Every structure is written in C-alpha cells, then in structure tokens.
Swiss-Prot record:
Entry function: Induces apoptosis in cooperation with SIAH1A. Acts as a mediator between p53/TP53 and BAX in a neuronal death pathway that is activated by DNA damage. Acts synergistically with TRAF2 and inhibits TNF induced apoptosis through activation of NF-kappa-B.
Family annotation (PANTHER family): FINGER PUTATIVE TRANSCRIPTION FACTOR FAMILY-RELATED, ZINC FINGER PROTEIN 114
Entries under Pfam families matching the protein: SCAN, zf-C2H2, zf-C2H2_6
Domain SCAN box: 46-128
Name the record gives this protein: Paternally-expressed gene 3 protein
CDD domains: SCAN
Biased composition (Basic and acidic residues): 143-152, 161-182, 206-225, 295-306, 588-607, 868-881, 1071-1082
A Gene Ontology term for the protein's cellular component: cytoplasm
Stretch list, region 4 X 5 AA repeat of P-X-G-E-A: 1419-1444
Gene: PEG3
Record's subcellular location: Nucleus; Cytoplasm
Acidic residues composition bias: residue spans: 129-142, 1396-1416, 1450-1467, 1476-1496
Region entry 3 X 7 AA repeat of P-E-V-E-A-A-E, spans: 1398-1418
Organism: Gorilla gorilla gorilla (Western lowland gorilla)
Subunit record text: Homodimer. Interacts with SIAH1A and SIAH2. Interacts with TRAF2.
Length: 1589
C-alpha cells in the first residue's frame, strides 16, 4: 500500500475531518482557511459511513445514495488504488475481529498493513510489554495540560494509523492507511491527512505529547509506538480498559456520524478551530457556532438528534446520549485509583480534588475538554489540539449560553431547557475533571489493560467494554429520561434513544409520577386528576375549581418558548393562539351572568348553577361529568344521556334507592339555557316571589314557567310559591307546594305560600316519605309522569295512609303524582287529594265519589267535590286540613282522582279503586278535581269569599295577555320542559321509539284527555246523559298541537265557566251545577283550589263567542274549529263508562292541565297501543278499529276513531304478548295462521259468509310482526284493487303488485289461476317439491321439461303396445279365422295402478278374463249370475260364484270388459270376473267360441277410449286425452298420499269399461284442510281457495 504521504499529496483537497493538532493551531493563524482539502476529511466520511443511522422517513433509496457518497468520500477511489482501498478495508475488519485482549497491544503497534498485523499477532508473546505500555500512558494527562496550546504537526507516518474507533457494534478501523494519510498532511492544511479514522490523528498527537513530557521511555524515541499505544488504548476502549483518548475519539466519531460539527462560542471549533465559518462550513453553510449539522444532517434534523428550536444552543444526539453521556459519566469511577491500570488512573476523590484545584488554570478554560470523552492525554502539540477539540465539545454541552465554563463537577448548576440532562452533564464534567486533573498523579500510575475501566456510578458495577457499560447505563437512564424529554421533545434521535432506553416514556405526570410516551397521553392523563379534583370540588362545594396544568417551565421545556398560550382565567394552556381565543369565549360574559344567577338563587334559597371557576373547569375538560343525576349521583357528558338515565329512575321508582325524592332532577338542556336566558335578561316587571323585574310580560311568563317547572327548595324555611302571578292579589298569590314531612308523626298539613296569612289558614299536609324530608318538593313533572307510569304497573303494596290537601302548583302536583306512583310501589300510599288547577268542563264521573267517601273513614277531612258525582256523596266538607291533620295521623285529605290518571289509577292502586277507597288516596290529580277547582274558584271569586282558603292559580286574572307556564310544554316521559310545542313534539318522538306507551294491565290506556273527567256510573242521573257524551271527549284526552290552541281552548273553558258562574251563580250547565251543588255545602275553610284556567270572569270579553261542542262540552272560539271537532263525534260511539273507569294517566301540572287541551300529551289507543299527540289522531285511529270488524275486541265496545299516528310506534300488543309477537296472523275461530293480512282477510270473509264469526269473538289481537301496525290496519280496511293472480294476495297500488309478482317468477313451480298451495296456510313453500304430475302413471316432477320427456316415453310405449296388440289380433285371427281377437291397449292416466297390458281373451271355454272390480260386460249385453259376474255367451267359463281370478292382476281384457261407462263401473264396484286357469295375457284365442261375439268385441275394442274423471268426456287417443287434461289444471296440487301418484287424496285413472275406477274414492279429491271430498280437481282447487283466501 502506498504511504499516506502519497495519498495526501494526490488528493489534498478532499478532507473534512480536521487534524487534531492543526485544528487549533492553524485556525488561530489562518482563520479563513477552508477545510475539506485534506485526506482527514475522509475520516469524517468514514465515521459517517460506519455510523450512519437508517431513518425511515428519509427513505431507503436516499439512504443508499448517502451511504455510497460517504463511502466514496472516505475511500477516495479517485486518489487511491484499488489495492489500497482493499487493504484498508481488510485491515479495518481484521482489527475488529482480533481477540479483545490483543486489541490494545496491536493498536499500540500500529500495523500499517495486514502483513504487519499478522506478524505482530504471531509474535504477540515476545512483543507484549504491558509495563511499558502502562508507563507510556501515565504521562498523558500532565503533558496534555501543559502543551494543549502548542500545535506541533504530526511526526509519524503512523500518527494516524492506530486510531480506530471500535464501538460495540464491531466496526473496524483501518489504522494503517489513516496513519499514512495523516502523515502526508502538511501543517497548512490544518487537517492532517488521516486514513479513514480521525481518532488516529488525535491519538497520534497525544502519543507524541506523552513522549515529550513524560519519563522519556521507548515511546519518546518512537512516537509511532506511543501513538500506536494510544491507538491501542482508543481501539480497545470499546472492549478493554485502555486510554480515555479512545473514549474521546469514540464520542467524536459518533458526533461526526450524525453529521454534527462542533463549535464553541469563543470561535474554537470542537475538532476544527474556526471551522464554524469555513471549510466544511462553507460547504455546509447551515452550520455555525456551537453544535452544527451537516447539510444532510440538517435535512434530517430530527433524525440526527438536533432540536428544532435550539440549534444555536445545542443538541443531544442518539449516539452521544448512549455512549458519551453514560461513558463520560462513568469517567469519574473509571479514573479511580483502584483501577490504576487505566491510562490516567487515579481515584475518584483524588481526581475530583485535583480538578477542582486546577479550575483557575488550564482546566478553567478547558475544564471540560477531556471530560466528555473520558480522555487523559499525553502532553504534546497534537495532544493540545486534541484537548481543545474536546474542550469545545464539552463547552457545547455545558456552556451553551456563552457565559463560560461551569465549574461544578456535578454538571451545570442551572438547567436549560435545551441542554442535556443533569446526569449527562454531571457525567461529562466529572470525566473531564478526572482526565485533566492531576497528570503528575497519573504519571505514577501503571496501566493495566486487563482492568475494568467503566464503572457505574449508580450501582458500582464495572465494565471492560464501553458498549456493555452504555447498555448498563441505559437502565439507569430510565429514571432520568424525562428530564431529557422536556428539552428534546422534537428530536427524533433523542426520542429514539429514549424509546430504546425507557420504552418511549418520557413525559411524566407531576401528580402521580407516571410517565407517558406522548405528550397527548400525558395531557389525557392529567385530565383524570383534574376530574377527580372536579368531583372533590363538587363534594366540597368549592367555588373555585383548581385547574391543574403544566407549569410554564414544563411547557417551555416541552413545546418551546413560543408554543404555548395560557388562559388567565382558568390557567389552561394551549399550543395555538386560536385555541386560546376560542377558549376565552367561554369566559366571556359569564361572570355577570353567574353573579346575577347566584344572587337570584340565594334569594330563593337554591344554588343550582356552579361557580364560574367550576363551570369553566367543567368546560375545559370537555364538559365531562357536566350533567349529574341527583338521584344516584351519576354524571353524564351530555344532557341527553342524563335524560335517558333519569328515565330509569322515573320508571322504576326514583325514590326507592335514595329513600327520598330527587333533590334536584333538573336536566341541563334547553330549559337550562332558557332559564339562564331569562335570568340574563333585563327584567322590569316585578316578580313578587322571585324579586325580579322583567322588561316584558313575556319574560315574566318565562320566569314563572321556570319557577313552576322546577321547584328547588333548599329547606322548609323557603316559603316561596312556585307559581307566581303578578297581577294577583296577595291572597291569590298562594304559591302552594306540597312538601314532605320529616317523620310520619308530623302530619300537619300546611301550605307554603308567599302569603303567611294563607299559610296559617290553609296548611297543606306534608307528605312523609321514608321519614326523610324532601329538600326539594317538586321533581320534573315529566319525570313524575314516567314514574307514575312505571309504578302504576307495579301496583301498590299495603300503602301507608297519608293524605294531603290538594293544593298544588304546577310542579307540586306533578311531584305529588310522582311520589304517588313511587310511594305506592314502595308500599306507601300518600292519600293526598290531588286537585289540579285546570278547568274541568264537567263534573268528573269517577269512582272518586266512593273513594272519597271511604277516605273519610280514615281521615276526617275530605274534599267534597262535585265530581264525586252524587249528591248523596255530599260528605261534610273538609273542615280544616289543619284540624284533620292534627286530629288524625292518618289524616287523609280527600283525594280527588280523575280520569286523567287512568293508568296509574288502575295499576298504582293495584287491584282497583277499592283499595284506594279504603286508604282514601288517589295518586293522580283528577280532572274532576280540576272541574271542582274551577267551579269553586269562580264561585268564590264571584261571591267574593274571603281568602281563608289557599288558592292556587297558575293563570292570572284580569287583562293579562300572557299565561304563565302556559307555554311550557313538559314531556311526560322524562320531565323535560319545552317552551315550544314543536320542541316537545320532536322530543316525544324519541320516547315513541324507545318504549311502549301502554301496558297489558291497562284496559284503557289513553294517556290524557282534554276533558278531565272519567265516565262513571255513579254520576248524577240527571247529568248522566249529557256527561256521557262529554266524557267521550274527556276520555279521548284531546290535546292541541300548539300552545295557541292551548290558550284558546283554555280560554274557552275559562270563559265558559266564568259566564256560567256569572249568569247562574253556581250553575253553568249540568256539570257546573252539580259541581257547585256538591261543593256549596263546603265550609269556608275548605281549600279553594283555583284552577289555572279560572280566569277573572271580567277578563272574558262579552264579544268572545264560545262555540260549545254538544257532545263533549268542549268550547271553541272559531266555528270552523267546532265543525272540525264535531267530525270526531260524527259516528255513534258506544262507550261503556264502566270500561273506562281508569282511562287516563294524570296530567303533570297546572300547565299540563292547560295543555290537556293543546295536544301536547300522548293519547294511546287501548286496543293496539298506538300513541298520538292529538286526540283527533286517536279518534281517527280508533275509527279503523271500529270499522274493521277483524280488529274489534270484546272489551272494547267503543269505537274511537283516530288518524294514523304522526309517528308509527312499536306494536304494543306484540310487546305485551310476546307469545303472539312471533306468530303470524291467526284466526281465533279455526286457529289458522297466516303470513299475509290479505290471507286472513279472505279467510275471515269465509267465516262471515258462514255466519260463524261474531264481532266480539273475532280476533283478540291480530299481530303482524315485521309490518307496521298502520300497514296492517290499512290492509284490513282499504279496498284491494290489485290482486295477484298467482296467490290471490291483493295490493293497493299496481307498483306493490308488480313487486310481488316478481317473487313468483323465481319460484320452482307454476300457479294456476285457481290454485293455492295448502302449505300457504302456514308458511310458503321452502323446498323443491314435485309439482308436475304425469297423468298416465301418476309420477310427479319438479320441472315441466322432465314431464314432457316422460310423456314421450309413454307415447312410445303406447305405440309399442298398439303394435303388440295388432300382432296378437292377427295371431288370433289365424287360429280362428272367423273369430277376431281384438287387442286393446288401455291407458290408465292418473292411476296408482300400472297400465294394463294387452291381453288376449282365451277362446277356450275354461278361460275367461274379467276385471277384478268391474263386471265383465258381454258384447251382447248378457250378464250371467246373480252377482253380475261376467260370463261368456255360452257360459263355458262360468263358475258357481261367477268370478274368475286373474293371477297377474291385469285388468285389461280384449273383450272390452274394461270399456264400460264410468257410471256402470261405479255402480258395480264389487263385480269381479274370475279366471280359473289361464293368465289374462294368453296370446292365443283360447276360450273364444262365438265368432259374432268376437266381431262385436273387436268392433268395441279396436277403437279404445279414455274417460276424463273430471268432465266425463271420452277420448279415443291418449294425446287428445292428455291435452284435455291440461285444460282442467295446469298445475297438480302436490300433497302426500298413500300411493304414488295420488294428489290431494285423488286417484286419477283413465280406463276402458273394464279399466280401473274400481275404488270408491277414486273419483274423489280430498281437501287436506277440512277433509272434504270433491269429484274433480277444479272443485278442490276452488275449495282450497276458500281456506287460503
């Protein structure tokens, strides 16, 4: 190989990696010299080539190109020969594979080529002198310290040879070429030509320093040996204990491999002084002071471990973190005295002390130069440059801010976000101090290459190979990796290192210490802590919610200085300013709103809105747990989820679990927004109880709706009414709520009212619920309804008798209802009189009369209500609920039960009203009570009765244009309230899909009725006729779709009642009269329940003309409305009032009563469970049941008509009766099941024709699974215009029929026009069944083509038989010239008996052929024998019994015995002809004696004929007969029969007079359904159509 001088001379401008010696000296002298001109540049590329990291996002092709370029730059093929390149590569690889214990020694010898290396290895034992090597090592530190500024050029060809970087991956370093190349490098180039390894250069220089300044050993005379020794030390750094210079070069090599150029703030480059702006800097302008990257490194900044935002401050690369930080960290221990064999061997304490003492001198300026690479150096010129390089490298890591070296041996005292971690800095500083500390001390230390130079500071474990040590350090790095992660989040190289070290976890939670791979994961994790804090804050009712968030320093470390924005309100941080702006919108204007809200809530004693901070806290964390259920405490992210959840409580029993009513079941949602909206508005109108001023009356109404919707009373002390009416007098402002007792003993009834006077006068009884007070007395009215529904089904367990006065407000009533339902299921009946303040147009006819009478048995106070129907029921009016309550624990206010609580009344009471009668409780506010309330209120108003009774009014008197709470629409199902009916309508659609509205336990399941009364037989006789008609309307629970209708209707009722009161005083109509008469005897103390509809009579304009419905008493302002309404009553409704005693689920609240006439509630059809939001829809729907007799039921004598539902609901009947749900439509008369409604329709028509069906017994329930109920109804009632000719199913439009016909096209059979397969009675055909039957032999085939081919066989057989018969006849004629023996081929079609074969009648007297069942008819018509036996003319063959046996069973005779009329054959089925001897197929004419007979027979037989069993026609040819048969039926009904060929019990035969219709039922076709027999198939098919419709 050529010497390095030659190589460098040929290519002086191709080097980039600097000579360590010239690096410092030349940069100071010639700062503008350009690097990249010398062979040492090849070492840089060599290191890059050997340590290039594959990064996926760069791509494989680019990586390959990069590798090729680096290899070319390293090997420089344009300046070197192939032999040199090969020698270089082989030597490098050889040095890699030699034993570890030989590597230091071999490197010290610096073999120039492979031959020299082999020689060294052969003479290893003789040449090995560890003492000399150790001594040569000792002097490095001192020399390096003294001569670091000297810059002497390398003086040995081998100066760069031995310095090879051998990392743990076993990368070889060719030392010889590097020595040569570096030797030829002149000082001017500043980068001595090295082979491919820059470490060789440095080591050579350091070796020379050792030779000059130490004890002048053999290395002093032989600098190459010293250099080679250093090379050995460096080379063995990875594997064995040796000089720390190798560590330094190892680290430098790894930096170079990452494309990093090191520079220092003072302008001294790490490896090239001043190269920050020259040399490769010029080639790579992206590099500058500090640690800079090559262009390719810059392109993949993440890959090479360079922080995006801190390129000017420094970077930690992957390799550097692994090998440098941990190795340098171990330098402290590695330099310890117990490992004195190591080159600068000294104890940790010693070198620490020394390093601290020398800070002021050289170490102070270059204190970290040797540190990062664990280097102790011999002192000479090359060592100085080496140390400068190392110093700059360290300064890059530890003095990035340019403020000088940091002298703390533990590392930089202040942490920078962009510096490496303290562990690394500490390790590097310790190693630098150790390597630079005490050269004199290290000189005395011998070097032992077998020692373990790498010692772990954490656990004290030592390693001989740096790779093992680094791997070990990785385990400890996991503990401190998060520190790195804070500063180098964006560095891919660092992230890769961290992943390899700690599994990718580099973000640590400050709360629990958990680490995460991604910052997003950490953010999500922190939310958990935040939520926990939120819950804690809620529990502690804290006003300010703490927002745990990353600190500014953390954010700076993670995202950089400019990558976070903090919200000053909640301290939440964001990466983007836009996110912060969006977030701050949450806080905008909340403070004022919250202040107002809290003030109002405090006035009312309630705080339902959280503090702003807590509210913001909830919003910040994704609104999680924002909606909380007050029943069970569960929280939800969305209000809809909470609503769904609350249904569970309302259905089951919201009070069972907690033992109390929900403290607050307010569902945040639209109503919350509206509530906030109303509170946020400027309010000028005085709201007496709420102490709010409203700008507009509508706002006051909205506010009142809020109060009436949700009563949140924190304690008993809050005596504000929920229902507020500004214009009312103070006496009228009776805001009565029903509040629970804390114990059963406290049974005093009182009314909580804003008027203390009224409170004293008319206290309402508080309900005891589980002996627990209810802090909030009212749940959502809807929730209550649902609870009532669910509990009503359960039925009451022995209820605890409780009653309460029936003075309730909007939600109070609902609340009572809810608890009525819930308490009943819990075994307690709260016998409170639920008197709704809505108009009752007529006295309710319910069982309430009896119930109230019996309620008096247990309670002394009972409201005597006109609705209680009988003047005989005029129980003394409740004297004073207060008295009653004080006198009797079981004080049971009269409970007025209305029609509206049909379901609850039926189910909640359990067995019926009887139990309620005993307890005197009616859990549902009644429309009867409403009537009474209205009547009493108006009466009292007219009579100016004193305000001794508490009055509830939900609507104001006077000229107010608004109706408080009138616009509030509440959902029965979940309690949600809506300001617009359209919102409620949309909302109710959800419930329509979710659950059945009805229950099997309800005979009558109409949810609401316009009229508040129920038909009752106990009603006064004089009012009964009129009431019965009105009850119809009431039972229908007519509602109006819009709030305008509500107000209008309510106004009608109010005016109606008011005018009645004005004119009659007590009598408006029969209803009013009765109501007033009933209640006229009540004392003044009776609580006057003034309904929401009880408007000031003076309010009603005389001009307002009311049009009253004569049938139901409903009033309309517009005549057209009345006309439309009367259409409902256009038909006669047969209503058994007793059937509807429990017909309606109670309404929710006063506003609900108002809405009873607005159509906002659901009306349920008791027959099919269909629910409707308007009563007219129910009427129209029920008309279907009434008109369609198939759908009538015995228990439903009324025929309420209804439109189709606005939204089809699930089949309630099917849900109530799962056994029927899976079945098809089934006829209850005959049990026949049908898949299609049309089939049932046709089938039922048969029953009607036969008068077998009565309307009450037809169908209990017809269920069509899979089809909409409305579709079924339509199919039952609409005229069928288009009928399928195949199966008979009919359709409304041709499109449906066309779709249906396509079904039959794919079926494997053909339908005849009159054919319906009997299997359709139950289910359609599912298998491939033979449908094509051969008329000749009875065989059946699936396809008609097969049948055609089969018939061809029969034709061939017929021809053969004809020929055979002709031949036989000819033979017979030969025997008897005068006697012709005709041969006949008989075709028996459709028979299960095989075709008869030609037979020759025996001419001899002893042979005679006859059919077994058919009498043998002689040609001349003679019949001998009393039993019709067949005899020959001369009687020769006659037997005593006249029978001739036919052994082979053939039925055909040549004499025409089988050619007899069908009638004759039928008449003589038993006739048999015997054949004593001969077989029937004897060819000879034995037995044939009479020629005339033979002639006659021949004439008869020569032309055979075929009988058609269906039309009795006869055919002479089989083809004609076959064609004729096709005319009867193109399809044979296939049914199992006893014999092959039978079809529907029919045996088809075509025979001659002697042929075989010999069985009685051969001619009959049997119906499989009813067993009836028919003469022909056509009749059977027609009959079967009657079964299938």
């Amino acid at each position: 190989m050529l010497p390095p001088k030659h190589l460098s001379a040929t290519k002086p401008k191709k080097s980039w990696a600097p000579n360590l010696y010239e690096l410092d000296s030349d940069l100071t002298k010639e700062p503008d010299v350009i690097i990249g001109e010398g062979p040492t540049d090849s070492e840089f590329f060599h290191q890059r080539f050997r340590n290039l990291i594959y990064v996926e996002f760069v791509g494989p092709r680019k990586t390959l190109i990069k590798l090729r370029n680096l290899c070319l730059d390293w090997l420089q093929p344009e300046t070197r020969t192939k032999e040199e390149i090969i020698e270089l590569l082989v030597l490098e690889q050889y040095l890699t594979i030699i034993p570890e214990k030989l590597k230091p020694w071999v490197r010290a010898k610096k073999p120039e080529n492979c031959e020299k290396l082999v020689t060294l290895l052969e003479n290893y034992k003789e040449m090995y002198q560890p003492e000399d090597d150790n001594n040569s090592d000792v002097t490095s530190d001192d020399d390096m310290t003294r001569n670091r500024r000297e810059s002497s050029p390398p003086h040995s060809v081998h100066s760069f040879s031995g310095d090879r970087d051998w990392d743990r991956r076993g990368r070889s370093r060719d030392m010889e070429p590097r020595d040569r190349w570096s030797h030829t490098r002149n000082p001017r180039s500043r980068m001595p030509q090295r082979d491919l390894s820059l470490p060789v250069v440095a080591k050579t220089s350091f070796e020379m320093d050792r030779d000059d300044d130490r004890d002048s050993r053999a290395y002093e005379s032989r600098s190459q040996d010293a250099e080679s020794y250093q090379n050995v030390v460096d080379l063995a750094e990875d594997r064995k204990p040796h000089n720390t210079i190798q560590d330094n070069m190892e680290n430098y090599r790894k930096l170079l491999s990452l494309g990093v150029q090191l520079a220092e703030d003072d302008g001294h480059s790490h490896m090239t002084q001043g190269h920050s702006s020259r040399s490769k800097r010029s080639a790579y302008p992206s590099t500058s002071r500090g640690l800079k990257t090559m262009p390719e490194a810059k392109k993949s900044t993440h890959r090479r471990g360079i922080c995006e935002d801190e390129s000017s401050h420094g970077v930690i690369m992957e390799k550097f973190i692994k090998d440098v930080s941990r190795s340098s960290k171990s330098g402290r221990a590695r330099e310890s005295s117990d490992r004195s064999q190591r080159f600068p061997r000294m104890s940790d304490d010693n070198w620490k002390d020394i390093s601290l003492n020398k800070r002021e001198s050289v170490i102070q300026q270059r204190v970290y130069e040797g540190n990062a690479f664990r280097g102790g150096f011999r002192f000479n010129s090359t060592l100085v440059s080496r140390k400068r390089v190392l110093e700059r490298k360290r300064r890059y890591h530890f003095d990035t801010d340019g403020k000088g070296s940091i002298h703390d041996q533990k590392g930089c005292p202040r942490k920078k976000p962009f510096e490496c971690g303290s562990e690394m800095r500490k390790a590097m500083s310790m190693s630098s101090l150790s390597s630079l500390s005490s050269p004199s001390f290290t000189e005395s230390q011998p070097i032992d290459f077998g020692a373990m130079p790498y010692v772990c500071d954490e656990c004290g474990r030592s390693f001989s190979v740096i790779s093992e040590f680094v791997e070990h350090q990785i385990m400890h790095t996991r503990e401190n990796l998060y520190e790195y992660g804070e500063s180098f989040i964006h560095s891919v190289a660092v992230s890769e290192v961290q992943k390899s070290q700690v599994g990718g976890k580099r973000f640590e939670c400050k709360d629990c210490g958990e680490t995460f791979n991604k910052s997003a994961a950490l953010a999500e994790h922190r939310k958990i802590h935040a939520r926990g804090y939120l819950v804690e804050c809620k529990n502690q009712e804290c006003e300010e919610a703490f927002m745990p968030s990353p600190t500014f320093s953390e954010l700076q470390k993670i995202y950089g200085k400019d990558k976070f924005y903090e919200c000053r309100v909640c301290k939440e941080t964001f990466l983007h300013s836009s996110a912060l702006i969006e977030h701050q919108k949450i806080h905008f204007g909340d403070d004022k709103d919250n202040e107002r809200e809290h003030e109002r809530e405090r006035e009312r004693g309630e705080t339902f809105r959280p503090s702003p901070a807590l509210n913001e806290f909830q919003k910040m964390y994704g609104k999680e747990k924002m909606y909380e259920c007050k029943v069970c405490g569960e929280t939800f992210l969305h209000s809809s989820s909470l609503k769904e959840h609350q249904k569970i409580h309302t259905r089951g029993n919201p009070f069972e679990n907690k033992g109390k009513v929900c403290e607050e079941t307010f569902i945040p949602g639209q109503s919350l927004k509206r509530r906030q909206k109303t509170y946020n508005k400027e309010k000028l109108y005085d709201f007496t109880d709420g102490r709010d001023a409203f700008m507009q009356s509508s706002e006051l109404s909205e506010h009142q709706k809020i109060h009436s919707r949700k009563n949140l009373f924190e304690g008993r002390g809050y005596e504000k009414s929920v229902i507020h009416s500004g214009p009312f007098t103070e006496s009228q402002k009776s805001h009565t709520i029903t509040r629970p007792l804390e114990s059963d003993e406290d049974e005093k009834a009182f009314t909580i009212s804003s008027n203390p006077y009224e409170n004293q006068k008319i206290p309402t009884k508080e309900n005891v619920y589980e002996a627990k007070s209810y802090e909030r007395s009212v749940i959502h009215s809807l929730a209550s309804v649902e609870a009532q529904k669910s509990h009503s089904v359960a039925g009451p367990s022995k209820p605890k008798v409780m009653a309460e006065s029936t003075i309730q407000s909007f939600d109070a009533i609902n609340h009572q209802r809810v608890r009525a339902g819930g308490n009943t299921s819990e075994g307690r009946e709260y016998n409170r009189s639920v008197i709704h303040s809505l108009v009752a147009s007529k006295p309710p006819r319910s069982h309430n009369g009896n119930e109230l009478v019996e309620s008096n048995e247990k309670g002394e106070s009972s409201i005597y209500i006109s609705d209680l129907n009988d003047k005989r029921q005029k129980i003394p009016a409740r004297e004073n609920p207060c008295e009653g309550g004080s006198k009797n624990r079981n004080y049971e206010d009269s409970v007025i039960q209305s029609v509206s609580r049909a379901k609850p009344q039926k189910s909640v009471p359990g067995e019926g009203s009887g139990e309620f009668k005993k307890d005197g409780e009616f859990s549902v506010p009644s429309s009867n009570v409403r009537e009474y309330q209205k009547a009493r209120a108006k009466k009292k108003y007219i009579e100016h009765r004193s305000n001794e009774t508490s009055v509830i009014h939900s609507l104001p008197f006077g000229e107010q244009t608004f109706r408080p709470r009138g616009m509030l629409y509440e959902c029965q199902e979940c309690g949600e309230c809506f300001a617009h009916s359209s919102d409620l309508t949309e909302h109710q659609k959800i419930h329509d899909r979710e659950k059945p509205s009805g229950s099997r336990n309800y005979e009558w399941s109409v949810i609401r009725s316009l009229a508040p009364t129920d038909p009752q037989t106990s009603y006064a006789q004089e009012q009964y006729a009129k009431e019965q008609a009105r009850n119809k309307c009431k039972e229908f629970r007519q509602f109006f779709a819009t709030s305008e209708d509500l107000n209008t209707n309510q106004k009608i009722y109010d005016q109606e009642k008011s005018h009645g009161e004005e004119s009659q005083g007590e009598n408006t109509d029969g209803e009013e009269t009765h109501s007033e008469e009933t209640h006229g005897q009540e004392t003044i103390e009776d609580p006057v329940i003034q309904s929401s509809d009880m408007e000031d009579p003076q309010k009603d304009d005389p001009d307002d003309k009311i049009y009253e419905c004569e049938d139901c008493g409903l009033g309309f302002v517009d005549l057209t409305d009345l006309t439309d309404h009367q259409k409902v009553h256009s038909r006669k409704c047969l209503v058994d009032s007793r059937e509807y005693t429990h017909s309606v689920i109670h309404t929710h609240s006063i506003s609900e009563y108002q809405r009873d006439y607005t159509g906002e509630q659901l009306y349920e059809c008791p027959k099919c469970g269909e629910s409707f939001i308007h009563s007219s829809f129910l009427f129209e729907h029920q008309r279907i049941h009434e008109q369609d007799q198939l759908y009538s039921m015995k228990g439903c004598d009324d025929g309420f008509i209804a439109l189709l539902p606005m939204k089809p609901r699930r089949n309630r009947a099917a849900e109530r009766n799962p056994a029927l749900a899976g079945s098809a439509i089934r006829c209850l008369l005959c049990g026949q099941g049908f898949i299609h409604s049309s089939a049932l329709n046709e089938h039922m028509r048969l029953h009607r024709e036969d008068d077998l069906l009565e309307q009450s017994q037809m169908v209990e329930e017809a269920i069509i699974p899979g089809l909409a109920l409305t579709e079924f109804q339509r199919s039952q009632t609409e005229e069928r215009l288009f009928e399928c000719a195949v199966c008979g199913e009919s359709f409304v439009n041709p499109a449906e029929l066309a779709d249906h016909v396509t079904v039959h096209k794919n079926e494997p059979y053909e339908y005849g026009s009159s054919y319906t397969h009997t299997s359709f009675l139950t289910e359609p055909l599912k298998g491939a069944i033979p449908f094509y039957e051969c008329k000749d032999c009875g065989k059946s085939f699936i396809h008609s083509t097969v049948l055609t081919k089969h018939k061809e066989l029969h034709l061939e057989e017929e021809e053969e038989e004809d020929e055979a018969a002709a031949a036989a006849a000819a033979a017979a004629q030969e025997v008897e010239a005068n006697v012709h023996v005709p041969q006949v081929v008989l075709r028996i079609q459709g028979s299960n008996v095989e075709a008869a074969e030609p037979e020759v009648e025996a001419a001899e007297p002893e042979v005679e052929a006859a059919e077994p069942e058919v009498e043998a008819a002689e040609p001349n018509g003679e019949a001998e024998g009393p039993d019709g036996e067949a005899a020959e003319p001369i009687g020769e063959a006659g037997q005593p019994n006249g029978e001739a046996e036919q052994p082979n069973g053939d039925a055909d005779e040549p004499d025409g015995a089988g050619i007899e009329d069908p009638e004759e054959r039928a008449e003589e089925p038993e006739g048999k002809a015997e054949e004593p001897e001969g077989d029937a197929d004897e060819p000879d004419g034995v037995g044939i004696e009479d020629p005339e007979e033979g002639e006659d027979q021949e004439i008869q037989v020569e032309e055979p004929y075929y009988d058609c069993h269906e039309c009795t026609e006869t055919f002479t040819s089989s083809t004609a007969f076959g064609e004729h048969l096709k005319t009867h039926a193109s399809m044979i009904i296939f049914e199992p029969a006893d014999a092959f060929g039978e079809c529907s019990g029919y045996i088809e035969r075509a025979s001659t007079s002697t042929g075989g219709a010999n069985q009685a039922d051969e001619k009959y076709f049997k119906c499989d359904v009813c067993g009836q027999l028919f003469n022909d198939r056509l009749s059977l098919a027609r009959h079967q159509n009657t079964h299938t419709g």
